[in-house]
């Protein structure tokens, strides 16, 4: 691995999880690639609209890429439906950053179908909630298709609750298997978002920019920066972590399903301001 050996890395994160304070921060070495990725949107944020409308709204709001989910573009979509979607994306100047969250199981044939779909739509990353017995299959598939799998956390009670839960399961697997860090859910799990990025450095392929009012299980989603997410610090850490230029950096806003546009526009402005500030630093 490019950061630390997996074993020493997990030992370090175990100490952090236990509450040990360190004199130096983990994973802050500079990267040779400091280019910030494009800002996209997880289309679940626009689930109240039909796909064609949602993509137009994504463009009008200023996003450059989109992350699909099955409710907006199903894995069993026809070739005609996929072609029409790709044509609209091209006309709007949008690219696909990923698709998910998808489940993987020990059914290797079903797992392959998800990868074949991702290849068809041109998704470089699949965000996922993989069963433990799926990893042998995933190791083979990420090599064959050269498509990343990014494990998504879903907060308290989920098997991938904290960053260390993800690190433990990917330890001995292909480096294309990594993390999609939903920063909102990490807030719900009581974890500091910038610290999560440092811990996942080198295996971080997706980000869901999301904020919550309180660091507890039951809380309310809020506009970026109005809860516990320091967006500028998050973008800084992404740059330091060498987040891939084609990584899935997706704003996700789950509130106000029927009329989310004004709120998403406000979130977008916060994120772009932070990105512009960080990109101007030398």
For each feature predicted by the language model, list its residue ranges.
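Glycine-rich, proline-tolerant flexible connector loops at the mouths of alpha/beta enzymes
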Residues: 67-84
């Amino acid at each position: 691995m490019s950061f630390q050996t997996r074993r020493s890395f997990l030992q370090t994160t175990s100490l952090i999880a236990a509450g040990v304070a360190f004199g130096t921060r983990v994973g802050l070495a500079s990267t040779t690639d400091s280019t910030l990725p494009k800002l996209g949107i997880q289309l679940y944020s626009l689930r109240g609209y039909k796909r064609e409308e949602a993509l137009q709204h994504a463009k009008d709001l200023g996003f450059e890429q989109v992350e699909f989910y099955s409710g907006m573009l199903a894995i069993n979509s026809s070739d005609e439906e996929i072609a029409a979607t790709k044509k609209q994306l091209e006309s709007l100047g949008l690219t696909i950053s990923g698709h998910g969250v998808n489940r993987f199981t020990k059914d290797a044939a079903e797992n392959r179908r998800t990868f074949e779909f991702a290849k068809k739509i041109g998704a470089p990353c699949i965000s996922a909630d993989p069963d433990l017995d799926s990893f042998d299959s995933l190791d083979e598939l990420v090599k064959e298709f050269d498509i990343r799998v990014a494990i998504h956390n879903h907060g308290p009670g989920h098997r991938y609750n904290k960053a260390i839960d993800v690190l433990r399961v990917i330890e001995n697997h292909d480096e294309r298997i990594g993390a999609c860090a939903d920063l909102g859910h990490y807030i719900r799990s009581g974890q500091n978002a910038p610290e999560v990025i440092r811990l996942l450095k080198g295996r971080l392929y997706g980000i869901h920019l999301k904020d919550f009012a309180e660091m507890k299980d039951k809380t309310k989603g809020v506009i970026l920066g109005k809860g516990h997410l320091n967006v500028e610090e998050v973008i800084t850490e992404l740059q330091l972590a060498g987040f891939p230029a084609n990584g899935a950096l997706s704003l996700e806003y789950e509130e106000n399903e029927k009329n989310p546009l004004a709120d998403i526009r406000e979130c977008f402005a916060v994120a772009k301001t932070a990105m512009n500030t960080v990109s101007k630093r030398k």
